[in-house]
Regions:
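Bacterial N-terminal signal peptides
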Residues: 24-32
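Bacterial signal peptide processing site
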Residues: 38-40
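N-terminal secretory signal peptides that target proteins for export/translocation
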Residues: 1-16
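A short alpha/beta connector and helix-capping loop motif
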Residues: 162-183, 191-194
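C-terminal active-site subregion of NodB/CE4 polysaccharide deacetylases
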Residues: 55-152, 163-165, 169, 234-375
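Substrate-binding clefts and substrate-entry loops adjacent to catalytic sites
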Residues: 223-234
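C-terminal motif of bacterial Sec signal peptides marking the signal peptidase cleavage site
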Residues: 34-36
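Acidic (Asp/Glu)-rich catalytic clusters
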Residues: 142, 179-189, 203-223, 305-311
């Protein structure tokens, strides 16, 4: 059955396709045949959604009316075979936590070769990258039958994004590897969020502007990791505000005016005392406010779906990269054995499709414009 709810309202747009040349020829032909007929032309022009000027309406008084080309609707996403795709948009979503690349694999470092292998395995298993913001807003644009995955990188290490002496992107840094992979597999995407502390992002002062522009142009985001990588547990509310607000202010100076620093990865996974935790969500620094829409833990398991009744944007679990127990490789092995646990998209960003047996677990409160389909 269909229930209305959801986060964004989407409007279907019809495009009008008219041939100006055909209209003019038809008009001239009608005038030449019926000299006594008059033509009343409306001179008002309008613009279509793609910026093209729509030719004026032409009204010809003649025994035979001028036929206008039929309106053509934008093709809709074809409906899926639910018995084949078996969408489950209450399944688990991995938010993967990386840090830097290194010469050997550790709990916080991944070799370039292993990172490439991670991307390849994710792709082959049907995962496709999704922006963190889209996840928390319920804007799941993942194709039908595939699973969204969110890639995150903490600390802004130079191995995340490095320029060589000739100012080309190092093919063995994270962004270089992702760029090359996306060229070969464009449907995988390049969506990822990089979380920064104070100091020079990616440790190359003269290239910060280029790097940030490149990231934003290619679907990557910038997030907050606190100014000094503070331990939040002993801090007061004022100290937490300073750590987050100061870093947000510094990052915004390097970004377009309308870009929001509203994504937070908790350093060390720590939170302040119970009464101070509201400052993780919002606060201000020297009169400049900040407000986070996603707060990430240093987790050890996948996140629940954003449509799950237990989802909490202020406490999103992450999967640690690596090959050990409860790290990325371990979880991928688990999904290979139990694929039904994964979030499986129905291919419709304006709809949430779930097996009817899970109806008690869904909660679309706060998501406007979405439809719920149970099957």
């Amino acid at each position: 059955m269909l229930l209305s709810s959801g986060y964004f309202k989407r409007h279907k747009t019809k495009k009008r396709h008219r041939s100006l040349s055909a209209l003019i020829l038809s008009l001239l032909f009608a005038v030449s045949l019926f000299g006594g007929c008059s033509a009343d032309i409306n001179s008002a022009e309008s613009s279509s959604p793609n910026g093209e000027v729509t030719p004026p309406e032409v009204i010809v008084e003649s025994p035979g009316p001028v036929e206008m080309p039929a309106e053509q609707e934008v093709p809709e996403v074809p409906e899926i075979d639910f018995n084949v795709v078996k969408p489950n948009e209450l399944g688990e979503v991995m938010v993967i936590m990386y840090h830097n690349l290194g010469d050997k694999n550790t709990d916080y470092a991944r070799t370039a070769e292993s990172f490439r292998a991670d991307l390849e395995r994710l792709y082959e298993m049907g995962f496709r990258t999704l922006p963190l913001r889209d996840l928390v807003k319920g804007n799941i644009t993942t194709p039908a039958g595939y699973t969204p995955v969110v890639l995150t990188f903490d600390d802004g290490h130079i191995t995340n994004f490095k320029l060589l002496e000739d100012q080309t992107i190092d093919p063995d840094c994270v962004v270089g590897i992702m760029s090359a992979f996306a060229e070969e597999h464009p449907d995988f995407g390049m969506h990822a969020t990089f979380f920064f502390n104070g100091g020079t992002p990616f440790a190359q002062k003269d290239s910060v502007a280029f790097k940030f522009n490149y990231m934003l142009e290619n679907g990557m985001d910038i997030g907050n990791h606190s100014f000094g990588h503070e331990h939040f547990k002993p801090l007061s509310a004022h100290e937490v505000e300073a750590a987050l607000g100061k870093n947000a202010v510094q990052l915004k100076k390097l970004l377009p005016e309308n870009y929001e620093i509203d994504l937070l990865a908790l350093p060390y996974g720590e939170r302040p005392a119970e009464g101070q935790r509201g400052t993780l969500i919002e606060g201000q620094y020297e009169g400049v406010p900040y407000k986070n829409i996603a707060i990430l833990n240093v987790g050890w398991k996948p996140s629940v779906s954003p449509f799950d009744v237990s989802f909490d944007f202020a406490s999103i679990q992450r999967v640690q990269s690596g090959d050990g127990h409860l790290q990325l490789t371990d979880w991928l092995d688990g999904y290979a054995a139990n694929p039904d646990k994964r979030f499986i998209s129905d291919g419709r960003a304006d709809r949430v499709a779930i097996p009817a047996i899970l109806s008690e677990k869904v909660d679309l409160t706060g998501f406007e414009g979405l439809e719920l389909l149970e099957y």
